[in-house]
């Protein structure tokens, strides 16, 4: 059940992926969909198969009026904390749009500081098509980065757990220690470094 969006305003949707993982960037995306060129099958990226996400990823990039990916690094996450780093990454995604939106819908319960009107929408990735599109761009982008990290460090299993603190990942982290891409402010990483 999607929320009706005012079609007289240029609207962007923004979502993030990767607040919970112990490693890598928090990745956000901003998308302005084209009402004249709808995309069928948009939904929260977590509810879609990987195959469907990849197909929609290409379709979104092709059909959207504008799209942008923003991120915050592990160093920024450690310096700012994960919430503030996520807000920064969202600001970067909106700033990267080739067209400035008049209204921005953000998934969740708080908005970053933006130069245009912004509204937080709880469960927005299931309610606002542009947020669904943003969630797909962010998730496919971040998953690809974890697959690439896995190719450099296969012993850590990043392609399987995507950096999330699964039992397998925590055991590997305790045994091998963190790589530079880890978020050193996160408790399991601090524990592995012997500073918790």
UniProtKB/Swiss-Prot annotation:
Source domain of life: Bacteria
Binding positions (a divalent metal cation): 15-16, 107
**Which EC number(s) does the record attach to this protein?**
3.1.26.4
The question of whether Nuclease is a record keyword is answered with yes
Listed under GO biological process in this entry are: DNA replication, removal of RNA primer; mismatch repair
Task: Report the catalytic activity.
Answer: Endonucleolytic cleavage to 5'-phosphomonoester
- Indicate the segments forming the RNase H type-2 domain, all copies: 9-196
Q: Which cofactor does it need?
A: Mn(2+); Mg(2+)
Q: What is its main location?
A: cytoplasm
Q: Which Pfam families match?
A: RNase_HII
Against SUPFAM superfamilies, the record matches this protein to: Ribonuclease H-like
Q: How many cofactor units bind, and how? A: Manganese or magnesium. Binds 1 divalent metal ion per monomer in the absence of substrate. May bind a second metal ion after substrate binding.
Provide the GO MF annotations for this entry. Answer: manganese ion binding; RNA binding; RNA-DNA hybrid ribonuclease activity
Keywords from UniProt, A to Z, are: Cytoplasm, Endonuclease, Hydrolase, Manganese, Metal-binding, Nuclease
One cellular component GO annotation, for this chain's record?
A: ribonuclease H2 complex
The record's family statement is:
Belongs to the RNase HII family.
- HAMAP family in alphabetical order: RNase_HII_B (MF_00052_B)
What's the stated role of this polypeptide?
Answer: Endonuclease that specifically degrades the RNA of RNA-DNA hybrids.
Protein name in UniProt: Ribonuclease HII
Its taxonomic placement starts with: Bacteria, Pseudomonadati, Pseudomonadota, Gammaproteobacteria, Aeromonadales
The gene name on file is: rnhB
